[in-house]
Amino acid sequence: LSRSSGPAHQQPQLHRPLIPAGAWSIQKRTSEATISSAVSAPTAAQALLERRGRGSAAFAERFDVVHGAKHVLPSHPRGAGLLTVHDFLPLDRPGDFGRLKRRLLPGPYLASIREASALVCVSEATRDRLCGYVPQARANAHVVPLAGGGLLSVPDELVSELQERRFALVVGDDSARKNLRFLVDLWPAVTAEHPDAVLAIVGPPSWKGEEQRPDPKGVRRLGFLSDGQLAWAYRNASVVLCPSVLEGFGLPAREALDLGARLITSEDPAMCEVSGDRAVHLRAVDPGPWVAAITDAMGGPRHAGSPPGGVRQWSDVADETVEVMQRVLHS
């Protein structure tokens, strides 16, 4: 999580590789002269505008495939509709959202899923959630996992606050589902064993701007980092922690493994899927096992080793997404 995160951060990562991927009609749309800007609006209003085919001149044009990269498709797309499904947070955890989003987002999300010619899910866990809400969509849903390899080629930039420190890294916003408070509250038990240990939190404050209790000694909230600083933090952390209670994919876990970090995650299905047997998985409700695993990692080597085989790149995600598009066009 550097300048941004989630689907909004992943869209440019995905679409850049489509140009050299030879993606026929997509390639024709990539010159600046053919890019149409959209009206800027709050998330819920943006979803409604896109569903109604408004807010951009592009909605009046004809395409081979209309790709909804972030949850929503126009209700009558001028071309086959391909929808990328990241998660179901407005339905799974409505209490995390304000009243307007709770009321307005689920309808466009579910309608887009039902009307899409094909669906791309970012994980098997997300496809399982999809089929729970829209069972008839199972045959139409393809899994194309995301990638974390974007930081591999980025030169490291030192994070001065963490220089020569033993630290655990957690990447994510401070919303309830990310469960960062769970780590903050257990940190005094870690510093009882390792007095100089630092919990480095990278990311924005809570979506809802809740008032925060004072953090205990050793907790550092770093806000946003550049890509180079984030890469440095992953590579130099004693351990990366992912205590989230619900994810669509789990990009920080993927990035941590790709950069050789030791990793502890919750037992969330998406987290377990993305990290497999290369991470320690613990229930994120009992602090005892987490304290034991973190203190063990603080006393061990910083690196878990290189990932086996090749690291998945965003070009792989683009290629597999194009394959689904081709099936849609030829079906």
PLM feature spans:
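Carbohydrate transferase catalytic cores enriched for Leloir-type hexosyltransferases
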Residues: 1-331
